[in-house]
Amino acid sequence: LDTIKDDIVFWSAGSKPLELVKSGEVSMALAYNGRVGAAILSEGENFEYMWHGQVLEQEYICLTSGSPNRDEALAWMIHASSPESQALQAKYIPYGPMRASGIDLINAGEPFFHTGVNIMPHMPNTPDRLEISTVGDPVWWSDNGAEINERFSAWMGS
């Protein structure tokens, strides 16, 4: 990293990567795919995705022991994790559903995006993109995150 440090622009707000590319300050950026998709699909921007090597995150829905309104919470969890609910968010933002059956529903319903365009080219977890992706390891980060963050912060300050 030392060899490229002077050429890196760090950002702390999700809108910043696209602003940096648009302004010409940088030629490429790491950005949230939902923001890139919104810029392309809703604002007509001319960005392109580079999916190779993307890092997919795992998200969890849990119900803790002794939670109040357990039955209602469980009903919501079942609803939220259904293929239909997972697919529905893609009508408005190209975040991939956590279930492959949700991707199947989107694909079968194209054009799926609320503006009437195809959303599948903007989805991060199509089968072909999964082949060139890596999945983050939450256990590794739990075990090593504090040390890595400390080392990275020290490097940033050097």
Residues of each region from the PLM?
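Active-site rim elements
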Residues: 62-64, 75, 135-140
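Conserved C-terminal helix/tail region of periplasmic/extracytoplasmic solute-binding proteins
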Residues: 125-158
